[in-house]
């Protein structure tokens, strides 16, 4: 299987599993928690059909990548992404992040610039800053909320995932119509196959402050979010994000949950392909 080495922990290398398909302008898809690059399958198919080269990879600790105990912060995640781009020598690339993956996009552009990047897309994003503080009243939740997630993951991450996906896909509304029990089970299996250290550390990255990164986004951008998102509510994320980046193309998908890559794939793909074609 194809891997890119991004670091070392003691005697073992830290390797990222990736896939690279198609020809044309490269589109790099960066997955969310607690999934893997395979969560993009409905977008990958549409992008390949439209003539793009599609690269997916599993973030450290997730999917088929190595499961180190360290490196779970956005500076390291962005450095890992930079290694992927440099190793594959990608030029004129489009970075597309979903959920947690939007953090890599913002931090990469802020830290490494856009010499290799043509466009960026933020789908169901966590920007600009999820933590509710005195200087950030638009934040989604206080510190105690995120501490509770970490505690739940450490206590029994498998039980946590079951509850997490209920609201990830809004199963009370979409199960049996927009998503099958089997697809939900696959998401759970993917989450369970990831590393414990990654699962426990990831929630502490969600409240990273990206407010200083946003002004450095100097290429065309897309912000797309579902109005029914219970995981990252739109009023705390995309709508505030768009005010900070008014030049971005902005799309709201009516009623879509957080996991809209699957439940509302047609709407997502239509908006993404239109953005790429401009």
From Swiss-Prot:
It comes from the Bacteria. It is an enzyme of class 1 (oxidoreductase). Residues 26-264 form the AB hydrolase-1 domain. Keywords: Antibiotic biosynthesis, Oxidoreductase, Peroxidase, Plasmid. Its EC number is 1.11.1.-. GO terms for molecular function: peroxidase activity. Disulfide bonds: none annotated. InterPro entries: AB_hydrolase, AB_hydrolase_1, AB_hydrolase_fold, Epox_hydrolase-like. GO terms for biological process: antibiotic biosynthetic process. The active site is at residues 99, 229, 258. PANTHER family: HYDROLASE, ALPHA/BETA FOLD FAMILY PROTEIN (PTHR43433), NON-HEME CHLOROPEROXIDASE-RELATED (PTHR43433:SF4). Homotrimer. May be a chlorinating enzyme involved in 7-chlorotetracycline biosynthesis. Belongs to the AB hydrolase superfamily. Bacterial non-heme haloperoxidase / perhydrolase family. This is Non-haem bromoperoxidase BPO-A2. It comes from Kitasatospora aureofaciens. The gene is bpoA2.
């Amino acid at each position: 299987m194809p891997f890119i080495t991004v670091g070392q922990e003691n005697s073992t290398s830290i390797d990222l599993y990736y896939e690279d398909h198609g020809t044309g302008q490269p589109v790099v898809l960066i997955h969310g928690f607690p999934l893997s690059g395979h969560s993009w399958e409905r977008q990958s198919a549409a992008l390949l059909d439209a003539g793009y080269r599609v690269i997916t990879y599993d973030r450290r600790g997730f999917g088929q990548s190595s499961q180190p105990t360290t490196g779970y912060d956005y500076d390291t995640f962005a450095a890992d992404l930079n290694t992927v781009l440099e190793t594959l020598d990608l030029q004129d690339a489009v970075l597309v992040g979903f959920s947690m993956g939007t953090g890599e996009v913002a931090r990469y552009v802020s830290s490494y610039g856009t010499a290799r990047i043509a466009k960026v897309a933020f789908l169901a994003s966590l920007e600009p800053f999820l933590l509710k503080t005195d200087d950030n009243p638009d934040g989604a939740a206080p510190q105690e909320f995120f501490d509770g997630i970490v505690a739940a993951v450490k206590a029994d991450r498998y039980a946590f995932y079951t509850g997490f996906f209920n609201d990830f896909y809004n199963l009370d509304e979409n199960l049996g119509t927009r998503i099958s029990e089997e697809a939900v089970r696959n998401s759970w299996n993917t989450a369970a196959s990831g590393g414990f250290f990654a699962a426990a550390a990831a929630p502490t990255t969600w409240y990273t402050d990206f407010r200083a990164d946003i002004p450095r986004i100097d290429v065309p951008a897309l912000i797309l979010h579902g109005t029914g998102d219970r995981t990252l509510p739109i009023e705390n994320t995309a709508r505030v994000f768009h005010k900070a980046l008014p030049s971005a193309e902005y799309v709201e998908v009516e009623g879509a949950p957080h996991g809209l890559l699957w439940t509302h794939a047609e709407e997502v793909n239509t908006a993404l392909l239109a953005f790429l074609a401009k």
